[in-house]
UniProtKB/Swiss-Prot annotation:
Alphabetical list of HAMAP family matching this protein: GTPase_Obg
Protein's gene: obg
Reported cofactor(s): Mg(2+)
Gene3D superfamilies (alphabetical): GTP1/OBG domain, P-loop containing nucleotide triphosphate hydrolases
Span of domain Obg: 1-159
Keywords: Cytoplasm, GTP-binding, Hydrolase, Magnesium, Metal-binding, Nucleotide-binding
Pfam families assigned: GTP1_OBG, MMR_HSR1
MF annotations from Gene Ontology: GTP binding; GTPase activity; magnesium ion binding
Binding site for GTP: 166-173, 191-195, 213-216, 284-287, 315-317
Keyword Magnesium found: yes
Protein name, per record: GTPase Obg
């Protein structure tokens, strides 16, 4: 299936049905009075997050989605039937915003999450609402209200714990194949990966995380070189980035340090927040380097690249070092989740609310709790 991560649609809710201005007419009832029912409510347009969908291709060509109108009211105080709602199923991770103003409307991050995109119009009143002591036979009625109409932009950002980035042919697809259940296309030419791939990495029976592989970046991606940098949006939700570097390129003219620096530069051009995100350096294809000279090659690269963070040496093809990398990632992600849960519990705990600003008082308060 073709991967589409952007779409523009128009949603039109149904119009409410008109009220009825009928009079009660029955045998032996001379002055029946008004009995016009109300019009039915117009159908609404809903969006629902579905984890079984991973692309917005359904909305690339079907751009207009219209709900049904409500039916008019009838005599004998019969209300009109409400228009049927329509449901638009979207991938988890879809961001919905107003196309004309750019204002964000919703971020569907949970399976089954539901949102009303366009509210159906209210049905009109029948003449039964207008009778009074001075007007026993009203002919007034009201028409139904129009439903909401909106132009929306849909943008998909995949939900993953770990994101892979690097130059084309750095071995990203090989790595995600080696450690997860994903099976992306792998070949010996640049830009084999044309769209993001997701894989689930299982570390033990009850521990796992999701890893995302995006198309490779090259220098000038911000200006549209290669496949550009539009796929970088899929890394914005990740907890940690793996910067994959081909430490032993076959082309002697290729400088791994310059390539790695170019990737960081492209990240900065796209979003400064991505540069600040936790990033680990993963040196791939170390099995090609003779073991006696491997340590020096790695240390020279780290020194020239001026890297201060975690460094992992792997071979995605043979699996060397992949287990250590996966276990380290799982431990790191677990620690992030624990910190997040602790912060949430602390925010909800009344003992930590409205604490005094004075440091001495805070220390005393904490000791009292212990």
């Amino acid at each position: 299936m073709k991967f589409i991560d952007e779409a523009r649609i128009e949603v039109i809710a149904g119009q409410g049905g008109a009220g009825s201005a009928s009079m009660r007419r029955e045998k032996f009832i001379e002055f029946g009075g008004p009995d016009g029912g109300d019009g039915g409510k117009g159908g609404s347009v809903w969006a629902t997050a579905d984890r079984n969908i991973n692309t917005l291709i359904d909305y690339r060509y079907a751009k207009t989605h219209t709900a049904k109108n409500g039916e008019p009211g009838r005599g004998a105080d019969c209300y009109g039937r409400a228009g049927d709602d329509i449901e638009l199923r979207m991938p988890v991770g879809t961001i919905i915003s107003d196309y004309e103003t750019g204002e964000p409307i919703a971020d569907l991050t949970t399976h089954g999450e539901r949102l009303c995109l366009a509210q159906g119009g209210v049905g009109g009143w029948g003449n039964i609402h207008f009778k009074s002591s001075t007007n026993r036979a009203p002919r007034q009625k009201t028409n139904g209200k129009s439903g909401e109409r909106r132009k929306l932009k849909l943008e998909l950002k995949v939900l993953a714990d770990v994101g892979l980035l690097g130059m084309p042919n750095a071995g990203k697809s090989t790595l995600i194949t080696a450690v997860s259940n994903a099976r992306p296309k792998i070949a010996d030419y640049p830009f084999t990966t044309l769209h993001p791939n997701l894989g689930v990495v299982r570390v033990g029976s009850e521990r796992s995380f999701v890893i995302a592989d995006i198309p490779g970046l090259i220098e000038g991606a911000a200006e549209g070189a290669g496949l550009g940098h539009r796929f970088l949006r899929h890394l914005q939700r990740t907890g940690v980035l793996l910067h994959l570097v081909d430490i032993a390129p076959f082309d002697a003219n290729v400088d791994p340090v310059a390539d790695a620096a170019a990737i960081v530069n492209e990240l900065r051009k796209y979003d400064e927040a991505l540069v600040e995100k936790p990033r680990w350096l993963v040196l791939n294809k170390v099995d090609i380097i003779p073991e006696e000279g491997r340590k020096k090659v790695v240390s020279d690269f780290v020194k020239k690249f001026k890297w201060k963070g975690p460094v992992f040496e792997i071979s995605a093809l043979t699996g060397m070092g992949c287990d250590k990398l996966c276990y380290s990632l799982q431990d790191y992600l677990d620690s992030i989740r624990r910190d997040r849960d602790d912060a949430g519990e602390r925010a909800q705990d009344p003992r930590y609310q409205d604490q005094p600003e004075d440091k001495n008082q805070i220390k005393y308060f904490t000791c009292a709790l212990l």
